[in-house]
């Protein structure tokens, strides 16, 4: 008798997906607060890469350590030399490391390089809503690349409504925010990288245990941020207890968020999991305004409502 995994049970899918989404929503104000506490200015590229890299490198090591303690193999063979099931343990063959490297670049290095650059030049609330573009992009990409995810009228309408919401961010006067390449442009590139990485998660699960693969992607991707950051002269100009606490919170968000989200993507249709990220722009916008004292413009309500409505329309499909 086959038992359904807890990550495939509808009620638990909702709980785990929303937990990851809420955690990621809090990352917006925490990253900006962290850069402020560490004295990192918008033009300090190396420092931003170092700050991001430390977060993900440590998070990846924590996940790998937990994987090791829980009995998962991070090398592919048992102590007796027998090969594990490649779908469950370790890396099946050397060629699969290239896939893991690609996943690390998209899921961590490029994804968060663009994110940290964009967020340092943009308001947290605006960035959170703009980043909801990744949800609709995942739905569209999934319908193109996976037979199990088919484009339907509901999905099409939901995506259109969502994109209109994103365009609504540019309504109003200049004082309420306009498109900028260093701000909005970087966040859009971040969203595209995140969407692409979501599609690759299924391929990752065929090559290595998803939990182990997540640890690899975060640690490798984090290292690929730390090294160039150091080479560019990056440092943490000011180190304080508050800054370290914020960094620990960001590490926890990465560890919990990616572990849950990637596991869900490997067990369920991509589109059905990604739409729960509708909560990210809402949480990100609200927490940014509350924690950072940012001005809450009326267009944030319009954009957030349209984006959330679009994702709700997609999620209603059975």
Enumerate the predicted regions with their spans.
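Specific transmembrane alpha-helical segments of multi-pass solute transporters/efflux pumps
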Residues: 27, 70-127, 131, 168, ...
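Helix-helix packing/entry segments at the starts of transmembrane helices
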Residues: 54, 108, 112, 126-133, ...
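Hydrophobic transmembrane alpha-helices of multi-pass small-molecule transport proteins
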Residues: 63, 140-141, 153-172, 225, ...
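Loop-to-transmembrane alpha-helix entry segments
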Residues: 128-131, 147-168, 177-184, 240-241, ...
